UniProtKB/Swiss-Prot annotation:
GO molecular function annotation: signaling receptor activity; transmembrane signaling receptor activity
Annotated site location: Cleavage: 1088-1089
Maturation and modification: Undergoes cleavage by tra-3 to produce a feminizing carboxy-terminal isoform Tra-2B.
Location of region: Interaction with fem-3: 1133-1273
Gene Ontology CC: one annotated term: membrane
Miscellaneous comment as given in the Swiss-Prot or TrEMBL entry: Isoform Tra-2B is likely to be cytoplasmic because it lacks an N-terminal sequence and potential membrane spanning domains. The MX region mediates a post-translational regulation, essential for the onset of hermaphrodite spermatogenesis.
Membrane topology summary: Multi-pass membrane protein
Basic and acidic residues: compositionally biased ranges: 1276-1310, 1451-1469
Taxonomic source organism: Caenorhabditis elegans
Compartment(s) of residence: Membrane
Annotated spans, MX regulatory domain: 1392-1413
Keywords recorded for this protein, A-Z: Developmental protein, Differentiation, Membrane, Receptor, Sexual differentiation, Signal, Spermatogenesis, Transmembrane, Transmembrane helix
Name the UniProt record assigns to this protein: Sex-determining transformer protein 2
């Protein structure tokens, strides 16, 4: 963990120096007189985006109803449906500040202009009862609605609903009556007025009120006002009664009650023929008409009537109008003047438009008040009511906004009803904003939007990525955010001000990506290292090949999943805990790193002057993430050292062998406690207590090893498995790297060509008012004396006037110079003269704008804005482009001393088209060249021995992401193009760096073996499995990020206020997709570049598959040429200790045949008992032993026992077998056997005269067991005889011999099958090997029938069987020996690791004690799964957890495949001629 070998710390130091070097260079570039007054900067809004607002006298909401089939909507059916829509809008109510408002409160009412001819001061002088009368008339005035129903009488019903002409008349009458009583007093007579129509009440009370005498109300004024009231009453009266959709008469409203009356009339007619004639029904309507229920089918009946235009049958009551002729004229109706002439604004053709046909769209315009007009109306209402007005312009704007949203919701709701779907009419609110005035998007809304996006992404990553420690990761994410914002505010403010613009959004996006990436990296590192520590396993830390595990990609997917569950932890542990200085820096890396500074400075100075702010946005997150990762590694390293020290002390204290009672205590779980254990028990218990179980427990019947994958969230685990499976499939394609790399490079070349293709963009139609160009200077807190500012402005004015094609409209600087020459007598009073000039010439305030004056004598107000106005002499496109280019050069020249900004229609249009896009291509190519060099240097320093081809390909494809996005931005002429390309470059680097470094690290581990201590065991016939952890991490990161931005894009497309963010969000999604695609190409192409090197290394250096093969080849080379004819040295004769034991369950079981067993047993019966037969080996599928006696004619089947051969004779079959020493008991001999098993057979010899008594006891035991097995052996012999009668004895004998040879070869082959990550198991001794010499103890395995095999899930193991099966001194240590004390032998460990203990599901038998548990019992992260039981039958009762049907289908498919394989193998054996 030294600094010079830690690349993470070195990268942090380099990034820090680069960042602060750029900041220091920027400070030197500023004026030396610059002095910062405020410690914390201020924020100034310059507008993030530009939107259009309405500039008319009132707000118009347009509603369009379109017939999808293009049918002419001038019909009864569509007018009726349109009337229902307006009826719903008229009853629309919203809740605003604990009060209810309707359309009548916010709509514009043109009739009230009749009373606005006099001034407001005159109206305030009216008596209170007159003011009350005028206020109520204003409330009853109809709203301005432009609709085709204005041509019909139906509009009066709608206005009656909106203005409450027929509702709340009692309340209206009471208000007018109270104002009248207040005027006349208590003693006068009170008139009685009663009416259900609001305008009638106005007329009646107006007659009474104007009869009252008033001193302030003269007769002339009274008469004039009374005439206006009559005019108002006349203006709202209808002129003719033409109904759009009448039922009985025009006065009948179109509501459900009248439809209900019609339904009642239809239901009263029982005869369908009469009903059909009277109501003009069709044949298809018979079922509906006869089964009609007016209560239950009310809504369906109304819609059915509208579809069939059932109102035609009432044509005798009201004449059907000519709809095309009526609606094409001037349809004012309620809106007309005194002469009854129509107003042009209400022309009928205005209400129709065309999409598919001429009249398939019906339009309605509802006019609303502006916030200013609404504020005035509300204040006047509060004044008349005697309330203190609380209305402000902000509240008025909020009320208008809420009502417009409610109007859109109501329209959308109406569009989804059943009637609209039947007649296929779509209703929507049109966007009718007038593009006359530009207004910046609210910075408050933008800040809220950014915060919500931040929160959305953090929530998704917390759930799906940071599942190991979600709260801790989220907390560190926000800590990095806070520190970055704090540093940005201090070092990136311009003159103490941070401008809220699109550049700030770019820095926020860069911060978000970097912070998410570093937080994810830290979370993964900490989680994986903690799992390695929890296992307390001794990793091979002295080797760099801990993670070099090979697996055949064509093997079972479950084996691949099992391998993947360990490779992540092993690789993380190897990278962190390796003692070797593997990732060392290349030579001269210090000198090479110095080149980074001038390259970055060139890019900052000539290309992007804001690159220092990008570095500031990344620096805090990078530093904190690096520190967090190093701290975690150091902490886990110390914890690991403590565990290893503890294990060494335990091994030293328990080195002596445990026998007798100590052995019983040990297997009972009572471990001897030492002083060291007492000292460390507190620490170990705290470690285990703080750790959570990482894996799910496997049930005894399951074989799904994917549950071992340590990803707590199921979706994340499944996704990573899919990504890894796809990656493994891609690795099989040898030419895929070339197939993908060539098109990727061609796409970059094509993108470069697209940057120079002239794209036709929109042309601009201008008038004389759009020819002006304004040069503005915004100087925020510019603390210099006025003389320097004036000199800079004077120089700029001279430079811009040197452009000959511009003429000056206003130049405040020249005006000030003339004023200064006339009044300036003292050179020290220049600042005071400026303020005097501003105050004396107020006309200049339109040119010079400022908000407040500073108190000091040497400072300028904040903000202080200067404006110079010029005009274009020539308006042709070529001249304007040349002027724009000259202005851009002048603005860039003065950007250091001033902050000039050019605005204007012509300038902005041609600047975007001509200047920006022409310079954009050269800018991107220059940026690409600089970053290719920079990324190559970074790769050379921080990667592991990169090749030239791989480095160039990585740099090219990372920069290719930027070029491809730049071409896309160029083709679509998108704004903020520089922001998109910078983000593309940053995202491309993040997506490709980790997988690229992992590939290079893997390459060095394979090819640079001289720097390691061991040789990796790799199979030359299998493809090398590349590191896939980094690829899966990057895929999970970017897929979730793309998902978050996709959700954001959907929200932006739905919410109208966020539509302006839709296009930037889509561009960000495209950037991430392109970055991930190029990252995949980098990984595949880089892998195939050095794959040939790896294959050459395997064939040339290893010369085979394993280390043992390599040793054997070396021995063969050293043999003399003269001894080549001697017998070859067998590989199994070398005493080569394997690195780790083979896997027990990955080798498939041998094919088993019942016929073989029956023939074998019959042959044994008929054979000569005195003739010695071959000793069969133990089959992997059977656990019983068959013992043959040398002096007996019977076979003994002893379950779970081995035959002991002492002095060349079988103990189980010969009663006269001699034991070592006369008079020795069985217990003494068994103790001797145990001592022999502990010391090894080479260190203990038996005497052939010992053990007579022990042999007798053993013989008695065998006799008893022989009697118990007599019946079964007899039945088996009878069955064998029946089979042999069908064939000749000689053929059976030959066939049996051939089958024995085939089974023997299959056993040898099965024994040598390799596990997924280990070399082959050495073969056992040959079958025909002679018996060993006298005086040695050997174990001979025999085959027992299938019926006597122990069920490891229900029957406990036998200690004697473990001792007999695992006491061979040639066996390697048990693979789980490191989880038990050092004194535990292999049989003891095997007994403790039996499946009965590790997968126990039931209760223990009485008297049986559980053996000692391993060290990692409570936090074991991987366990060898049990073999799959294809004969498993589910229990009859229902399981506690529902099992899907797909699981049972999969089980049946496996069983069927297994049976087919067995049948094919059996048929192959029968068809073999040798058999």
């Amino acid at each position: 963990m030294k600094l010079k070998y830690n690349k993470l710390l070195v990268s942090v130091v380099i990034v820090t120096f680069v960042t602060f070097g750029l900041l220091l260079a920027e400070c030197f570039g500023k004026s030396i007189d610059y002095q910062e007054k405020s410690i914390f900067p201020s924020f100034v809004s310059q507008g993030f985006f530009e939107t259009r607002t309405n500039n008319e006298e009132y707000i118009i909401e347009k509603i369009a109803q379109t017939q999808e089939n293009g049918v002419d909507m001038r019909s009864t059916l569509h007018f009726t449906q349109h009337g229902y829509l307006l009826n719903n809008i008229s009853n629309l109510k919203i809740k605003f500040r604990q009060k209810t408002y309707t359309l009548n409160d916010v709509c514009f009412k043109p009739h009230i202009t009749i009373f606005q001819q006099s001034s407001s001061s005159d109206q305030n002088e009216y008596p209170h009862y007159i003011q009350r009368l005028l206020l109520e008339m204003q409330r009853l005035s109809p709203c301005l609605i432009v609709t085709p129903l204005n041509c019909f009488y139906d509009i009066y019903r709608i206005h009656g609903e909106i203005s409450n002409w027929n509702k709340n008349t009692d309340f209206l009458n009471r208000r007018l009556r109270n104002s009248y009583i207040e005027a006349i007093g208590e003693n006068d007579e009170r008139p009685y007025v009663k009416s259900n129509y609001g305008p009638s009440l106005i007329k009646s009370w107006a007659d009474h009120m104007f009869d009252l005498p008033s001193k302030s109300f003269t007769n002339s004024t009274k008469d004039a006002l009374f005439q206006k009231i009559k005019l108002w009453l006349l203006s709202i009266e209808p002129r003719q009664k033409t109904c759009a959709a009448s039922i009985h008469s025009c006065d009948t409203p179109l509501d459900s009650e009248h439809y209900f009356n019609i339904c009642t009339d239809m239901q009263s007619v029982d005869n369908f023929a009469e009903k059909k004639t009277k109501f003009k029904l069709e044949d298809v309507d018979e079922e509906f008409a006869m089964n009609l229920d007016c209560v239950d089918d009310q809504e369906q009946f109304i819609e059915w009537m509208q579809e069939l235009e059932i109102r035609k049958m009432y044509s005798h009551v009201t004449e059907k109008p000519d709809y095309p002729n009526v609606v094409n004229q001037t349809c004012d109706k309620i809106f007309h003047d005194l002469n009854s002439t129509g107003i042009e604004f209400f022309d009928g053709s205005r209400s129709f438009s065309s999409t598919k046909s001429q009249f398939d769209t019906m339009q309605t315009e509802i006019v609303l008040l502006t916030p200013e007009m609404l504020l005035s109306a509300m204040q006047h209402s509060d004044f008349v009511n005697g309330f203190e007005s609380i209305w402000t312009i902000e509240k008025a704007e909020e009320l208008i906004h809420e009502f417009r949203l409610a109007l859109k919701e109501e329209t959308e709701k109406f569009k989804e009803n059943r009637m609209s779907k039947m007649i296929r009419v779509t209703s929507r609110v049109l966007d009718n904003t007038v593009t006359t005035k530009l207004q910046s998007f609210s910075e408050k809304q933008t800040i809220h939007f950014v915060v919500n996006v931040h929160s959305l992404i953090v929530i998704l990553f917390t759930i799906f990525v940071w599942s190991g420690a979600p709260l801790r990761s989220a907390f560190m994410f926000f800590v990095r955010d806070a520190l970055t914002c704090l540093l940005f505010c201090f070092v990136c403010s311009t003159d103490g001000v941070i401008v809220l613009d699109t550049e700030l959004i770019k820095y926020i996006i860069v911060l978000t990506l970097a912070n998410l990436y570093f937080t994810t990296r830290s979370s993964f590192c900490t989680e994986r290292l903690s799992r390695c520590i929890q296992r307390e396993k001794r990793f091979p830390i002295n080797s760099n090949f801990a993670s070099l595990i090979t697996v055949d990609t064509m093997t079972d997917s479950r084996q691949i999943q099992y391998f993947l569950s360990t490779v992540t932890k092993y690789q993380a542990a190897q990278d962190s805990y390796s003692n070797e200085l593997f990732e060392r820096f290349p030579k001269n890396w210090g000198c090479t790193s110095i080149l980074i500074f001038p390259i970055v400075f060139v890019y900052w100075y000539f290309i992007d002057s804001n690159f220092d702010k990008i570095c500031v946005s990344v620096l805090p997150s990078f530093c904190l993430a690096a520190g967090e990762e190093l701290f975690a590694k150091n902490m886990f390293w110390k914890e690991r050292e403590a565990m290893q020290a503890k294990q060494r002390l335990e091994n030293e204290e328990q080195a002596e062998s445990i026998t007798g009672s100590s052995l019983e205590k040990l297997f009972a779980g009572n471990k001897p406690v030492s002083n060291t254990d007492k000292a460390n028990i507190v620490k170990k218990s705290s470690i285990i207590r703080n750790q959570k179980p990482c894996l799910q427990d496997l049930s005894p019947g399951t074989y799904d090893v994917s549950n071992f994958m340590k990803y707590p969230h199921q979706a994340s685990r499944i996704f990573r498995e899919k990504i890894i499976g796809l990656y493994l499939r891609i690795l099989k394609l040898r030419t895929l790297g070339v197939i993908l790399c060539i098109p990727a490079i061609l796409l970059i070349v094509i993108s470069i060509g697209l940057l120079f293709i002239p794209v036709k963009r929109e042309t601009l139609h201008t008038d004389s008012k759009q020819d002006d160009i304004f040069i503005e200077f915004e100087i925020f807190n510019f603390s210099t004396n006025w003389k320097i500012v004036n000199q800079n402005l004077k120089q700029f004015s001279e430079d811009i006037e040197s452009i000959g094609t511009l003429y000056t409209i206003s130049n405040w600087q020249k005006s000030f110079e003339r004023f200064e020459q006339e009044t300036n007598k003292n050179a020290s009073a220049e600042w005071n003269i400026l303020f005097k000039w501003i105050n004396d010439e107020p006309i200049n305030s339109a040119v010079t704008l400022f908000s407040e004056k500073s108190s000091g004598n040497q400072t300028i107000a904040n903000p202080f804005k200067f404006r110079l106005r010029y005009g274009f002499d020539a308006k042709n496109e070529t001249t304007v482009i040349e002027i724009v280019q000259k202005i851009d050069e002048l603005l860039s020249k003065c950007s250091k001393n001033l902050s000039p900004k050019a605005v204007g229609v012509l300038y902005e249009h041609y600047h975007r088209i001509a200047v920006v896009w022409n310079l954009f291509a050269f800018n991107q190519l220059t940026t690409a060249g600089i970053f290719i060099i920079l990324l190559s240097i970074i790769t050379f320093i921080f990667a592991i021995t990169p090749t030239i081809k791989a480095t160039f390909l990585f740099s090219l494809l990372v920069v290719g992401t930027q070029i491809e996005v730049a071409a896309l931005v160029h083709l679509f002429s998108l704004d903020h193009h520089q922001i998109y390309t910078n983000l593309a470059l940053f995202a491309g680097f993040l997506a490709a760096w980790d997988p690229f470094c992992a590939l290079l690290r893997y390459r060095r581990r394979i090819l640079y073996k001289s720097e390691t201590r061991r040789t990796p065991e790799l199979a030359s016939k299998r493809r090398v499995l590349l590191p896939i952890v980094a690829t899966a991490d990057i895929a999970q990161f970017f897929v979730l990020l793309i998902t978050a931005f996709s959700i954001l894009a959907i929200i932006c497309s739905i919410v109208p206020e966020l539509n302006i963010f839709f296009v930037p969000t889509v561009i960000l999604i495209v950037i991430q997709i392109v970055a991930v695609f190029n990252s995949i190409i980098v990984s595949i192409a880089t892998k195939q570049m050095f794959e040939s090197e790896v294959r050459h290394y395997l064939h040339r250096d290893l010369r085979g598959s394993t280390t043992a093969v390599r040793v054997y080849n070396l021995v063969q080379k050293q043999r003399l040429a003269s001894s080549l004819d001697e017998p070859q040295v067998e590989l199994d004769e070398f005493s080569i200790k394997r690195s780790s034991p083979p896997c027990r369950y990955y080798a498939p079981p041998p094919k088993y045949s019942c016929k073989k067993r029956s023939r074998s047993s019959d042959e044994d019966e008929d054979s000569d008992p005195n003739q010695p037969g071959p000793s069969n080996r133990r089959s992997p599928k059977t656990g019983n032993k068959r013992v043959r006696g040398n002096g007996d004619n019977t076979e003994l089947y002893i379950p779970n026992r081995y035959e002991l051969i002492v002095s060349g004779k079988s103990v189980g079959g010969n009663t006269s077998a001699a034991w070592n020493g006369p008079g020795s008991t069985l217990e003494q001999n068994m103790n001797a056997l145990e001592e022999c098993f502990e010391l090894g057979v080479d260190e203990y010899d038996f005497d052939e005269h010992d053990g007579d008594e022990g042999c007798e006891l053993v013989q008695d035991m065998l006799d008893r067991e022989r009697n118990l097995m007599n019946k079964r052996s007899t039945a088996q012999r009878r069955e064998s005889r029946n089979i042999e009668k069908m064939k000749k004895s000689q053929e059976n004998l030959d066939k049996e011999k051939s089958e024995e040879k085939i089974s023997e070869s299959k056993k040898n082959q099965d024994d040598s099958i390799e596990s997924p990550n280990l070399p082959g198991t050495p073969a056992n001794l040959p079958v025909d090997e002679p018996l060993p010499p006298v005086g040695r103890l050997y174990i001979v395995e025999h085959v027992l029938p299938e019926e006597y095999r122990r069920d490891p899930l229900t029957e406990p193991p036998s200690m004697e069987d473990c001792i007999r099966a695992h006491s061979d001194p040639n066996l390697p240590p048990h693979p789980r020996a490191d989880q038990y004390p050092a004194s535990f032998t292999r049989p003891m460990v095997e007994y403790c690791e039996d499946i009965y203990w590790t997968h126990r599901t039931g209760q223990l038998p009485p008297g049986l004690q559980v053996p000692r548990r391993p060290y990692d019992y409570y936090h074991i992260t991987e366990r060898t799964p049990p073999p799959e039981d294809l004969n498993w039958v589910p229990p009859a009762e229902s399981p506690p957890i529902p099992i899907p049907q797909q699981a049972f289908d999969l089980l049946e498919e496996r069983r069927r495949n297994h049976r087919e394989q067995q049948d094919e193998a059996r048929e192959g054996d029968l068809s073999d001629p040798e058999v």
